[in-house]
Design a protein with these regions (language model features):
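Conserved beta-propeller blade signature
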Residues: 27-34, 111-115, 164-168, 221-225, ...
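Blade-level signature of beta-propeller repeat domains, shared across WD40, Kelch, NHL, RCC1
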Residues: 272-319
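C-terminal tail/sorting-segment detector
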Residues: 3-5, 396-417
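Repeated scaffold domains used in trafficking and secretory/extracellular systems
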Residues: 66-74, 95-104, 142-158, 198-214, ...
Length: 417
């Protein structure tokens, strides 16, 4: 990041408001999907691992209970009668029916999003109430019939730095994006493409690249960790997957089935097959070292927390804080477009903010203040075009809007590409 961020131009006398990504303490836990039995293959029980101690919690949710009564994600009301499915009957009522291998933690809303392996549906757990919501009016992949080779089963999911959830099928022919706010929307982004430099290791190959998990970094990228321990980096803009290599140091029989970023910016990985230990992986070298679990080590089909892998360039010697997501406000008072920002400019639309004086604080991801601007806002429905200096560094910028009472009224993030 440059020492000084060029001042952003203001037009029409309105307010500069952009987006906000805040660096704060990393999550020191991961959620894990396990069986009720230590080595069991039924991925229907939710636990939490304390990364400070390596200890598992008791079962937080019994996802195998077919008498479970969930809620509609659309109406927010509890289903009045048990659900039925032509293939699975009333077993579809169980929160983790048919098992779960794709889980993502939404830090802002304190939710766990997931999809059952053989039920084409997005679901989420409200961790404040432990109520479970099913989006049963909308297909997740559009392919309810799962193929014999399990290529169209979703086994990877994460909340990325842009605040969207992303899920991927085993064969990487579908990258699914979903919103995480009040209104859930699902978009099929299409197939992942192999980088020409991959030297024959395809992201679509079942022998090398199926299964596993995905994590997100702080520059808008995704990392695939396959069950065969291969690692790919995915550019979300181009959907190109670049093969980075194979994890070294894992014992024979260890398959990566869950991955999450820990407080030291290492990737903790767990296995559904070999539960003698968890491991941490250095994303630069792909070398694995054992991670000690206290007490019983459970096999796990997936892991999730809210940490992003810190990969952005930072000043030498600076402390790395993992990036915690803080998504765009959803009250409609302010809208920003486009985001990610292209051509070094974007528009800010003010819909319902009261007239008055506001202070804009712009900081980088290290928390250093770059700009403080006081602006008078005259009314609603004002649109402000913001032009960035073409020489401004690419990446995230952090912005907070403070009112006359020194209260933050809006915060979000932009990614400048």
């Amino acid at each position: 990041m440059k020492k000084h961020l060029p001042l952003l131009s203001l037009l029409t006398g309105a307010l500069l408001i952009t987006n906000f990504l805040i660096a704060q303490k990393a999550d020191k836990f991961v959620y894990a999907v396990t069986d009720i039995n230590k080595q069991g293959p039924n991925w229907s029980y939710l636990r939490k691992i304390d990364l400070n101690t390596g200890a598992y919690s008791d079962v937080l949710l019994n996802g195998a209970d077919i008498n479970f009564r969930a809620y509609s994600a659309t109406t927010r009301k509890q289903f009045e009668a048990p659900l039925t499915d032509v293939r699975y009957g009333t077993a579809v009522n169980a929160a983790f029916a048919t098992g779960v291998a794709a889980l993502a933690y939404d830090k802002k809303n304190n939710r766990l999003y997931y999809t059952p392996m053989f039920i084409d549906q997005l679901r989420y757990i409200d961790l404040k109430t432990m109520k479970v919501y099913y989006l049963n009016e909308m297909a997740f992949t559009g392919k309810p019939q799962k193929s014999a080779d399990q290529g169209n089963i979703v086994t990877r999911m994460v909340i990325a730095s842009d605040g969207y959830g992303y899920a991927m099928t085993n064969d990487a022919t579908q990258l699914i994006r979903f919103t995480t706010g009040k209104k859930l929307e699902i978009t099929d982004l299409g197939t992942i493409v192999d980088d020409q430099a991959n030297k024959g290791v395809s992201v679509h190959n079942s022998c090398s690249s199926f299964g596993g998990d995905i994590i997100a970094d702080d520059e808008g990228g995704l990392y695939i960790f396959s069950a065969r321990n291969h690692v790919f980096k995915v550019n979300l803009e181009t959907k190109v997957a670049t093969h980075l290599g194979v994890i070294s140091g894992l014992p024979n029989g260890f398959t990566v089935n869950g991955a999450a970023v820990d407080a030291d910016n290492k990737i903790i990985v767990g296995s559904a097959m070999a539960a003698t230990s968890y491991f941490t992986v250095d994303h630069k070298t792909l070398a694995a070292t054992p991670y000690k679990i206290a007490g019983t080590v459970w096999t796990s089909s997936d892991l999730a927390n809210g940490n992003l892998l810190a990969t952005a360039n930072r000043p030498k010697g600076s402390t790395i804080d993992l990036i915690a997501r803080q998504e765009e406000a959803t009250d409609g008072k302010i809208a920003i477009f486009p985001n990610p920002v292209t051509n070094n400019q974007f528009a800010v639309q003010f819909n319902e903010l009261s007239a008055g004086t506001y202070t804009i604080q712009v900081t980088d991801v290290m928390g250093r203040q770059m700009v403080q601007q006081v602006v008078a806002l005259g009314g609603s429905k004002q649109v402000q075009t913001i032009k960035l200096n073409p020489s401004a560094a690419k990446g995230f910028y952090l912005v907070k809007v403070i009112d006359q009472e020194n209260k933050a009224v809006y915060s979000t993030k932009i990614l400048v590409q």
